[in-house]
Amino acid sequence: DFIQPMLSFMTALFTSDFKIYLLLIGSIFGYFLSRNIWTVVSLGKKNPYWYGLLFILVFSFIYAFWDINVMRFTLATHIFFFGWIKLLLYKNKWGYLFMIFALLVHFSFAIAIAVCLLYQILGKNFVKAYFIFFVISFFASDLNLATIKSQISFLPQNFIEKSDDYLDDDYKKKRVALTESKNFRGKFYQSSLKWAVGILLTTIYVHRKKIKGNLPLENLLAFCLLFVGVFNILSVIPSMNRFQFVSYLFAFTLFFAYFNGEINFKEKRIIYFCTPLILFYFVMKIRIGFEFTGLLTLLGGPFVALIKDGDIAMI
C-alpha cells in the first residue's frame, strides 16, 4: 500500500518501460522466496526423504513466481515469512523490521502481525489450548460479517475504509457463486491441502514429546496451531482465505523439519495417507501456473524478457 506506489514513482523517474518495473519487483520477490526456501532446507537433513522433497516443493509453490500477478500480497507474504521465521526460530530482532516492511506492502498483514504479537505474549506454554482452538477452527463454518465490522471500529479510518470491501455481504455472495461455478478440481484442491495440513499438524502435536527441548520446533508447532486456527476461522471473510496459505508456509516448514528426522511406522502411514491430498493440490497449482507462463518464461530468462514481447501462456 506504500511500497508499491513508491517503487512505481522511483522507476518512472528513470524509464517509462514497465518491464524495468516488473524486473525490480521480480528481483525483490525472487530474493525473499529463495531465502525462505533456504531457511526451510537448513532445518532438515542434507539428504531428505522423498516426502521432505515434496514438502519443499509445496512450500515453494504455495506462492509461486507466477503469483507475482497478485503483486502486493504475494510480495508481502514472503517478506512477512522471512521476518517472522527469523524472529520465531532464532530470536533475530531484525525480523521486526521485515514484518513492518510487509505491512507497508499490504495493509492486511496487520492482522497477521497481531497474531504474532499475541503469540509472543502467550508463548509456547499454551500449546494444549492452541490445539483445542485449532481443532475447533476446522468446524467454524460461519461468522456474522456485521459483527466483525463492529469489532474493528476502533481501527484508523483508512484501515476501516479498506476493509469495507472485504466485509461486504454482496462481495461474499459473488465469491461463493464463483466457487460454485468451478469444476471438482477447482472446488476442492485447496480443501485437500487444508485437511492434509490439519492431519499432519495433529500428528506432530500427538507426538510432540519427540521435539521436547528443541525450542525452535516447539515454538514453530505452537505458533502453527494458533496461526492456522485463527485464519481457518477468518477464512469465512472474502479474500481472507489467502492468509490460510500464508499459515501453510509455516506448517510446511514444520513438516520438513519434523518428518525429516526419525519417524515411526504410524507417522509414515499418515504421510502416505496425506500424500495424495498434497499431490492433488500441487498438480492443480502447476496447472494454474500454466495459465500465466509461456515458453519465453521458462526458456528465455529475465534478460530476453526485457527485449521480447508476445509470450503466450501454455494453456
Task: Go through the PLM ranges and name each one.
Residues 65-80, 105, 202-262:
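Membrane-water interface signatures at transmembrane helix termini and the short loops
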Residues 77-94:
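Membrane-interface transmembrane helices that cradle and orient dolichyl/undecaprenyl
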Residues 24-43:
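Transmembrane-helix motifs of polytopic, lipid-linked glycan transferases
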Residues 131-134, 263-283:
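Signature aromatic-anchored transmembrane alpha helix within multi-pass, membrane-resident enzymes
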Residues 63, 94-118, 228:
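Membrane-interface alpha helices of multi-pass inner-membrane proteins
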Residues 37-59:
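Transmembrane-helix signature of polytopic, membrane-embedded enzymes
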Residues 1-16:
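Short hydrophobic/aromatic helix or loop-helix immediately within or flanking a transmembrane segment
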Residues 113-241, 287-315:
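Alpha-helical transmembrane segments and terminal signal-anchor/GPI-anchor hydrophobic tails
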